[in-house]
Amino acid sequence: MGCVESKEAKAASARSKVIDKTLKADREESSRQAKLLLLGAGESGKSTIVKQMKIIYLNGYSKDDCIRMFDVGGQRTERKKWIHCFEGVTAIIFIVAISEYDLTLAEDQNTNRMVESLRLFRSICNNQWFVETSIILFLNKRDLFEAKITKSPLTICFPEYSGANNYEEASRFIQNRFENLSGCEKGKDVYSHFTCATDTNNIQFVFDAVTDVIIKTALKDCGLF
């Protein structure tokens, strides 16, 4: 006599098929999405950049061109949450407020904000999760930096700095300090941009370049670059 499947077994089998179908659809959707992780110390301007993204992409991306952006808190007490966002990252946008070279952390009055950002950037670049992950460096608040640098010398943060206290030389020095920590000499992809988070046109221009990085990463993953 043949074995007759019970109603419960049939229901369980049907549920299993639905779950498998849903998981497959989720994997396919995830493969079409680029995952961007926004990192940086507190007060770097991440929240403002997220607001600009909402303005620029008010209607969102197309179904076939989707980017998911994760903004996590930058203060020390919030960084322990970062590890939960590390898996499957397409690229990292690391944001540093270059105008805060003469300020200290809100949570630690003995630590310079620029020094903290340098330490954090180095730890991200050397993290095992991001060995092959492209990093986009936003040197943010360039407008405030340009207004401040002629009045407040860069030597407050970098005693070894011997250049002029003007935007061109001082900003180039800061850029080099970050890029020297990135491991770019070992082939790691790091893309630097000077940004003003309150300038929508500037952020749109920069984010167009970020999109190019995402496309390049996707092609590299497919062996086409």
Predicted regions span which residues?
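The conserved Walker
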Residues: G42
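Conserved lysine of the Walker
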Residues: K46
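Short amphipathic alpha-helices and their capping/turn segments at secondary-structure boundaries
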Residues: L38, E78-E87, S123-N127
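Conserved GTP-binding G-domain of TRAFAC-class P-loop NTPases and closely related GTPase folds
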Residues: E5, G88-F225
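Charged, amphipathic alpha-helical linker segments immediately N-terminal to NTP-binding catalytic cores
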Residues: M1-A12
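Pre-Walker A adenine-sensing motif
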Residues: S16-E28
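P-loop NTPase motor core
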Residues: K35, V50-R68
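Switch II (G3) loop of P-loop NTPases
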Residues: M69-W82, E100-L103
